[in-house]
Curated annotation (Swiss-Prot):
EC code(s) of this entry: 6.1.1.7
Name recorded for this polypeptide: Alanine--tRNA ligase
Function: Catalyzes the attachment of alanine to tRNA(Ala) in a two-step reaction: alanine is first activated by ATP to form Ala-AMP and then transferred to the acceptor end of tRNA(Ala). Also edits incorrectly charged Ser-tRNA(Ala) and Gly-tRNA(Ala) via its editing domain.
Name of encoding gene: alaS
Key words, A-Z: Aminoacyl-tRNA synthetase, ATP-binding, Cytoplasm, Ligase, Metal-binding, Nucleotide-binding, Protein biosynthesis, RNA-binding, tRNA-binding, Zinc
Length: 875
């Protein structure tokens, strides 16, 4: 009996654990502190800094089952998903890694043992082929002489992409970064399937399928193309779980493995589809995986960056559901079946199931409002098309008006063998894209700008003043030996009490001083393992090697500590009041206030806000001890400590406990007891995106200042109303009721005045061919009263044409009324449009009533004078 996908995943991890590897949990799909990546797309992403020598772990061997998304590239990447056997937006990458431990020999032998060992995957050895980089004789010899693969099944692959190291068997992360030769393992499905071995003209067939890539990471590629040896040669491997599952389950398509069979059946059930071979079922089954896990990792549908990629995938799935005949929202209903088929890999998703379902449902409901109209417009445009290409302007209109991502439009067009002018679409999108780039969350890559050898020891939990030594200085990202008065710089110390910005808490400010110099620190940031003090030399000069006294701004740090501790209390309170679906999505803690973004489906009710505020203040009054402990990450999670989904943690973590109320992983600075916070006050609650709410709050002195300001305001209002704060509500209600009554009386007076004005105007009408014509500019009449006056005049005059105008705040308001027996000759919309054009405006409406506006009041008399001639010509 073949293994299930979940069993294959576990067997891989168990095998490498037996070989001394640390089993490391999958990292978030949103790369942590790596602006070069849109999504996590390989198992090695979370170890990038380890390979570069910028980070250290307490293990030298690791194994993972990493969730990956590849959907941010060209549009046809997404279009292929569901239509080929192996294209996916979401997949799991099984990997084993060596950080300067074992190298080629063990990496190759481990792979062979797992694939062919009787107790493991037990694949027939004669079915396996391997490739090596053309000049990698060492790997070739290991395969041939030590493993025993016949030489005719070992293929050397050279630089086949037109440049040095541009080879299928030379792996590189990008234009820069870790790289090296690799060896790949292929499975031969047999001669009943078309295709040839790698390197042959028929290599693109489906007979020989790559199942494992083993990278021998030896170099760090620089921007100028040079290859710098890495500190220690390392190994990075990747094997697609879905691909190896297809091999072990004896099927040729990834969509035929157990996981996808079950998902496809669920898709058919919620959409009402009966043909299980329909490609749309594959599309939706793939897309629910990427969409659900992206939302769980904090990505929200939007029109920018990661959020736009997510929106594209969701809307493509919805459109395929529409093609299958789905009559109601269906996509969100697939989250539960997905959790079931993912096994242990779905545990984190299950924790956020309600939030993920709500976000997907909201997006589906929003798109459903425009999907049918957009498809109708596209169908109309395609039916009129003369050639085989839809113009970019129409594609952009579908995007801008109906929310159609261009790849969804291309999907529809492809079914009719029509292309989309994507260059034209991109041209129309350029302004939006420019704005998106400017507002992008991808900031500067500080580690790329400043490379610091060595580390700084942070001692700021216990000290706010400390002696240290300058180990490096930087100006504009470049290392220097010294800095002088007036220069802005980054100062690296061997040890420091300054907290570097992390986990939402801002960096410390303060002063570095020594013999003959003073350096004002305006911010503190991390640079790899080092801590950088950013600021300006206030006096004197300092150089590398100087002794310094580092003084943190104590009062500012104290306020930050209170706000950070209050954030933890509020997080726990939100989960109690709103539900356990609440998860932190972002935070900002500074010395003035705190801001907390969290997952929730709707605006909080006033009573919920009050309940959270009361609960936090209750914990403050309990004066709970705030304790920290350092422990293994697994032990911390087992103790119930909340970890931020997607946050990057070391193997040893700091657990912050506030009595029995809150336990979280946190590296920030905190109060000693909850009572130190003094008082907690929520100042606002708002939405930042679909499914994400934001609370802003203040503590301590800041909260007292808010209360004092509110009290002063109430006293001022009480004095104005000649009352006191005790009966203020009653006084305000009475004043509002009196105001409403006066407004009602005023409106009645205005209507009476308008009726009288209409009666006066009716005598000024002149007759043209049996039709009364009245044209007049009125003064002191509100624009909204003109319609009432026109109706009155039409009733009084019978067959009539009325044009009234007034000017308020320099703007012209026009209205035209035509009795129904005259509308066959004179249309009110045409008439008012003719007048509006002369006063710099436009308008329109029904044949019997139309209105318009204009900006040129000086042209109004002449415009009104032209009405008689225009009407006479029509009558």
């Amino acid at each position: 009996m073949s293994k299930s996908t979940a069993e294959i995943r576990q067997a891989f991890l168990d095998f490498f654990h037996s070989k001394g590897h640390q089993v490391v949990a999958s990292s978030s799909l949103v790369p942590h502190n790596d602006p070069t990546l849109l999504f996590t797309n390989a198992g090695m992403n979370q170890f990038k800094d380890v390979f570069l020598g910028l980070d250290k772990r307490n293990y030298s061997r690791a194994t993972t089952a990493q969730r990956c998304v590849r959907a941010g590239g060209k549009h046809n990447d997404l279009e292929n998903v569901g239509y080929t056997a192996r294209h996916h937006t979401f997949f799991e990458m099984l990997g084993n890694f060596s950080f300067g431990d074992y190298f080629k020999q063990d990496a190759i032998k481990y792979a062979w043992e797992l694939l062919t060992g009787e107790n493991w995957f037990a694949l027939p050895k004669e079915k396996l082929w391997v490739t090596v980089y053309e000049t990698d004789d060492e790997a070739f010899d290991i395969w041939a002489n030590e493993v025993g693969v016949p030489r005719e099944r070992i293929i050397r692959i050279g630089d086949n992409k037109g440049a040095p190291f541009a080879s299928d068997n030379f792996w590189q992360m990008g234009d820069t970064g870790p790289c090296g030769p690799c060896t790949e393992i292929f499975f031969d499905h047999g001669d009943h399937i078309w295709g040839g071995p790698p390197g042959s003209p028929e290599e693109d067939g489906d007979r020989y399928i790559e199942i494992w890539n083993i990278v021998f990471m030896q170099f760090n590629r620089q921007a100028d193309g040079t290859m710098e040896p890495l500190p220690k040669p390392s190994v990075d491997t990747g094997m697609g779980l879905e691909r190896i599952a297809a091999v072990l389950q004896h099927v040729n398509s990834n969509y035929d493995i157990d996981l996808f069979r079950d998902l496809i059946a669920s898709v058919a059930k919620v959409t009402g589809a009966t043909d299980l071979t329909n490609k749309s079922l594959r599309v939706i089954a793939d897309h629910i995986r990427s969409c659900a896990f992206l939302v769980a990792d904090g990505v929200i549908p939007s029109n920018e960056n990661r959020g736009y990629v997510l929106r594209r995938i969701i809307r493509r799935a919805i459109r395929h559901g529409n093609m299958l005949g789905a009559k109601d929202t269906f996509f969100w209903k697939l989250v539960a079946p997905l959790i079931d088929v993912m096994g242990s890999a779905g545990d984190e998703l299950k924790q956020q199931q309600a939030q993920v379902e709500q976000v997907l449902k909201t997006e589906e409901e929003q798109f459903a409002r425009t999907l049918e109209r957009g498809l109708a417009l596209l169908d109309e445009e395609l039916s009129k098309l003369k050639g085989d290409t839809l113009d970019g302007e129409t594609a952009f209109r579908l995007y801008d008006t109906y929310g159609f991502p261009v790849d969804l439009t291309a999907d529809v067009c492809r079914e009719r063998n029509i292309k989309v002018d994507e260059a034209g679409f991109e041209a129309a999108m350029e302004e939006q894209r420019r704005r998106a780039r400017e507002s992008s969350g991808f900031g500067a890559d500080y580690n790329a700008m400043i490379r610091v050898d060595g580390a700084s020891e942070f001692k700021g939990y216990d000290h706010l003043e400390l002696n240290g030594k300058v180990t490096a200085l930087f100006i504009d990202g470049k290392a220097v030996d010294s800095v002088s008065a007036g220069q802005e710089a980054v100062v690296i110390l061997d040890q420091t009490p300054f907290y570097a910005e992390s986990g939402g808490q801002v960096g410390d400010k303060g002063e570095l001083k020594g013999a003959g110099f003073s350096f004002a620190v305006s911010d503190t940031q991390k640079y790899g393992q080092a801590i950088g003090h950013i600021g300006k030399v206030a006096s004197g000069s300092l150089k590398v090697g100087d002794a310094v006294q580092a003084d943190v701004d104590e009062a500012r740090r104290h306020r930050i500590r209170l706000n950070h501790s209050a954030t933890h209390l509020m997080h726990a309170a939100l989960r109690q009041v709103l539900g356990t679906h609440v998860a932190q999505k972002g935070s900002l803690v500074n010395d003035k206030a705190l801001r907390f973004d969290f997952s929730h489906f709707e605006a909080m009710k006033p009573e919920e806000i009050r309940a959270v505020e009361d609960l936090v203040n209750a914990q403050i009054r309990r004066n709970l001890a705030i304790e920290t402990n350092i422990m293994d990450i697994d032990a911390a999670r087992a103790s119930g400590a909340m970890a931020l989904f997607g946050e990057k943690y070391d193997d040893r973590v700091r657990v912050l406990r506030m009595g029995d109320f809150s336990t979280e992983l946190c590296g920030g600075t905190h109060a000693a007891r909850t009572g130190d916070i003094g008082l907690f006050r929520i100042t606002s609650e708002s939405g930042t995106a679909a499914g994400v709410r934001r609370i802003e709050a203040v503590t301590g002195e800041g909260a007292m200042a808010i209360l004092h300001a509110q009290s002063d305001q109430l006293n001022d209002i009480a004095q104005l109303l000649k009352g006191d704060s005790h009966n203020l509500g009653e006084k305000v209600r009475a004043a509002l009721e009196r105001t409403r009554q006066l407004e009602k009386e005023l409106q009645q007076l205005k209507e009476q005045a308008a009726a009288q004005e209409s009666a006066n105007l009716s005598s000024k009408a002149e007759e043209i061919n049996g039709v009364k014509l009245l044209v007049s500019e009125l003064t002191g009449v509100e624009p909204k009263m003109l319609r009432t006056m026109v109706d009155d005049l039409k009733n009084q005059l019978g067959s009539t044409i009325v044009v009234l105008a007034t000017v308020a705040d320099g703007k012209v308001s026009l209205i035209a009324g035509v009795s129904k027996d005259v509308t066959d000759r004179v249309k009110a919309g045409e008439l008012v449009g003719m007048v509006a054009q002369q006063v710099g405006g436009k308008g329109g409406g029904r044949p019997d009533m139309a209105q318009a506006g204009g900006t040129d009041a000086s042209a109004l008399p002449a415009a009104l004078a032209s009405v008689k001639g225009w009407v006479s010509a029509k009558l």
